[in-house]
Amino acid sequence: DDESIQQAWQILTNGIYNCPAGNNQQGPHESIFCGRPSLNNFQASSWSKMCNYYDPTTTAEAARLMVSVAHKYRGNNNFEYDLVDITRQAIADRARIVYNYAVADFKSFDKKNYNTHTRQFLELLIMQDKLLGTRKEFKVGNWIQQARNLGSTSEEKDLYEWNARVQITTWGNRYCADIGKLRDYAHKEWNGLLRDFYYKRWEKYWQVLQDQLDGKLPVLPVGNSSTPTADNPAMTIDWYALEEPWTLAKNTYAASAEGDCIEVAKEAITLINN
């Protein structure tokens, strides 16, 4: 038995794994990275229910404890999987906190802190992408490769790849994504998808808000609408036009693990604590 590992699991047991009775959310907490950006981002899918039933800082402490003893378990597949998965959640939870800071900065016209927090948010997203690249289970390349392997001809392979890409992003054409609100229904925190799909959305969004703060665009009233109205600055962006090119692309993603998961997890903990 390892005291640090036991403590880490106890923290998770008392926190994120301790969903209270009566909570009717549809599955686990959804990552802030994976939903279309807005000023009231809480979940990724359009209909899922979520509530803050645990302290989001506790996952970082659990990850820190795992990292502190990781050298003793190098090469242990089960430990390394858990290390990456727990650290993945810690990054997402920290990003949600930083997101709230950035939104508050925008609403108060605090450009200095807005720049700081939006930069931190994007750094966390890229760090999660790097971390998940160390495990094949968290790589979009593995998903796409499996889809292409089902095809017998080049045409079939391309079709199956398109289906694989669409399923985890827009779920179909513009109508499905925007009117049907099926976008991000099957979102994934996966290496490759994070940096090439989710990062581009958030980078664009933060820049639009930055332009508003800089007077390059009119600062629109802050509302709670998720539809294209003047009350929602996010909707000055045509999200589907930004998303569709990735679903049509044929760029190759590595399917095998890349990098040292323990060393990258250490980097992630340092970034979370900054």
Task: Please place each PLM-identified region on the residue numbering.
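Substrate-binding groove of N-acetylhexosamine-processing glycoside hydrolases
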Residues: D1-N274
